[in-house]
């Protein structure tokens, strides 16, 4: 027994030392970051390859926002032969560290999928003038940072218009992660403004899940809304979105998909999808950098439905099921928004 | 069609308490034998994932349930083996297993979602309600008793069985004895280890079923860390129920009601910040701990104390 | 005989046995992790090289590791001191938040104070904040005999929602869209110690706390009473120990340490409070205390390990795309194997003692 344990101790120490020896730069050779050289397995290739880092808050498998950004990056990597590294689950507290890490490891571009990462990103960008940063839906920016943003209200406004046209109970339900953050309040005010523009009596019930992953709780939240008479339920809370939509379809009330196009889930109850794809903005950033035409803008470039940054995709299969006035109202509102005649009071 | 507030709340309360009921019965059984199962949270998460995974794989809900049960039995065995055989801190083992299963289920769900595209990750079919039609329309009774699925009826039956078993059968009395005084039980010829092992192993299966309830009856997919603290609430329910089956049962219902109320507070829009609404179950749990003060039962006497055979 | 010499050698240096077992636990975790990494088609050796490079191999990474070290150490100490007296404080997470909250409130009003006072008062406020939160669980325990495992756990959830409420409401920075407080003023921040790294003075405050706790425990009467009532409440009572008094002190100190962690993290690293401010520091503290066997040296080393795990797994993902849940798998396996190894350590030590008797 004792002999064995001593042997084990010695063995472990030896092994640990061997591992510590591995502490050296795994991509050694070129002297850059860990993936600077060919030895880093998946990398390799010419020096001219653009090295792009992409980070997100939350998990890659949220089936919406982050999944779309991740897939968009994979597609770009293939198309333009980029070397892409990613890190998920980057909480607000660590954003600065992670961004600095990438910038110092020799990445040419450091992108974030998360709106709220833009404030720390501006600080980091000042220290790395040779790196191009980029943040989806950013509201602040820097000289070496590419910042696009949707208006974050136009597509929701249109969803509100459609909901306002189809509701019979004049009660709409909105589910978000919290009910008092700026982004949640933007959702509420634009969705409500759209609905009330066609029917001033409409009431929007706004509730929070407090979780992106507690699917059962999200579903019960939607149950509450439906039971209280909401006949359109719109959910934007991570993983819960698809679950809430399934419930709505089962219960026979209208629903709207947030972030990605899920119009195919039902040809009867999904009114449409409010789409604001991170992949669209990420593509604009990477292509701008590659062509050298765009490597930074101090003021974020805000684009709406006209620019294709965001969109409300009406479910085509409803064309012959709903009254034509519904679609006319949407077209009219779209035209009004593009003409600049619509304003929504935002937080 | 609007449903009455009472019906919504009560039906929801039963649905939300069912996972608590499974996990709490598992925890109760283990604690009766003298072993804390603090890994309930992780075991539920594992049950949720593996129940979902095997259903997705085979297209058969029964096999999915079986998968969850097998995971539960294995994880229960691991907990039993470590905490009984080695006599180490049951709390620490439980916490370690929670961490491990959280990582494992998230990791596995990554593997799964990498291998399929998004739409192929949904289960086609869930375990539905068995009673439908006019019966489900009766006020209160309809929403509480009839609009529920098979697993809810199963756990109610299991609670009744547990109550009968621990009070009326020789084995049940022996189980209680093991939890109260293992040394004396051993002297009386009861195999302490066998009772403890079996209790903890079954406890794992029950917790896993509680998790599987979420993915196989409520939502058709798995999400990382989707149990969101339900295992801990279950442990609080055992305490509040003072280790009696009826007490635990009603405590779970109470927590279910609190979760439902937390939803309804928001929907009714009475101006309470949502964070307070979400705190309700946890505040209730603390009040519950206070309210059991000074009452006769403090759980099995040998609870949490490792028992090692005299060498 | 050789065997006898070995026994005598190990008897004198029993830390070698404990340490060896801990190493085995780490290796086991790495083995499990390695197999899983292999399963997703990534070269585990390369992944682990990224791990070590990320955590120790470069100045930024090492700075990050040290950055995580300070809050983790405080939380581990808080859990450890309570655990030794038989109080299971799972509330490190909530107490960490309470500390950060009080420090933030104090710091916001420190604009014109002298540097020493400006830094010290918020730290003290943090300590008090943590102690206040743990005293709630303590009062419930002492007055109502309420299970502290549950009450501290539930207080964690309540505290998290409370912080979410405050940073999006009363304490929200009006100039930012983010749900966070106004950054604390410069004079209140803990000074950075090294150019090019984020190492701040909080590191030494945490180390001082470690030494202080050790001193309190091993060299004072109060510490003796704490240990005695943890090991054997009955004999403590016979020995005339005021059990209730020593329990109250333990509970307060335990919460205070986690609160200190929150204050140091706020003043040394993040400068503003937000939801998710504590990235599981409180819970990791438990694993660290277990792994470190509740000894000062052990806790020091395991804090380093857990900090490195966080940074290293991030580096593995950046380098070769290993999913982050691997962190929890590694931590879980380490905690479980360390706790199991305690059994073997005890057996080995027993057999060594028997060897002497024979």
Locate predicted features.
Chain A
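C-terminal motif of bacterial Sec signal peptides marking the signal peptidase cleavage site
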Residues: 18-22
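Bacterial N-terminal signal peptides that target proteins for export
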Residues: 1-11
